[in-house]
């Protein structure tokens, strides 16, 4: 509060983290939450669309669906499980009319192809910690997506990412901490805080 923050969104990445988020949002008026399963957890934490919808409706401070998406960089979850989980999150997001918080790493084509199937649903897309290519950003802009920049954009080897964000419309750019990770230069390597 001392630095001017009015609201904070904490993101669910697993069933366990969602249980913690429910407790946190009840005791702190400025913290809101999301419900979702990170792609790395999608083979372990199997959920259905109704679970997401019911839990979101039962908690007025749950305001988003995710973090969800595809991450083919690591092999923490099977691709088919990630795709199935991502699709369920998208359907819940559309049903609730909540923003969809999307993680995409080494899966630009697959992520876009799936999101594009829902274009007519006017899905609200937030590309979390976006590090994708300019071409990927251009396609996502056609889906009216928002893009969040993390501390990565300040790293000296992020010139291509910096150029991509110059290309994105300013009213579609958000800033995120991805706390406690990805502190910006010159705090790199330290705990990242809002």
Question: What are the functions of these language-model segments?
Answer:
Residues 1-194:
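Mid-domain alpha/beta scaffold segments of enzyme catalytic cores
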């Amino acid at each position: 509060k001392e630095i001017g923050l009015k609201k904070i969104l904490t993101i669910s990445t697993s069933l366990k983290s969602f249980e913690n988020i429910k407790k946190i949002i009840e005791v702190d008026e400025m913290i809101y939450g999301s419900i979702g399963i990170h792609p790395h957890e999608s083979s372990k934490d199997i959920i259905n669309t109704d679970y997401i919808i019911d839990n979101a409706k039962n908690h007025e401070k749950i305001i988003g669906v995710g973090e969800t998406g595809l991450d083919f960089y690591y092999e923490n979850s099977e691709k088919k499980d990630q795709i199935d989980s991502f699709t369920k999150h998208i359907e819940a997001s559309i049903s609730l009319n909540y923003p969809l918080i999307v993680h995409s790493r080494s899966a630009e084509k697959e992520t876009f192809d799936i999101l594009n199937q829902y274009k007519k649903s006017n899905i609200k897309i937030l590309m979390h910690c976006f590090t994708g290519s300019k071409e990927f950003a251009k396609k996502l802009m056609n889906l009216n997506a928002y893009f969040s920049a993390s501390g990565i954009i300040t790293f000296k080897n992020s010139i291509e990412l910096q150029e991509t964000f110059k290309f994105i419309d300013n009213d579609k750019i958000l800033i995120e901490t991805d706390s406690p990770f990805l502190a910006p230069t010159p705090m790199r390597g330290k705990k990242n805080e809002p």
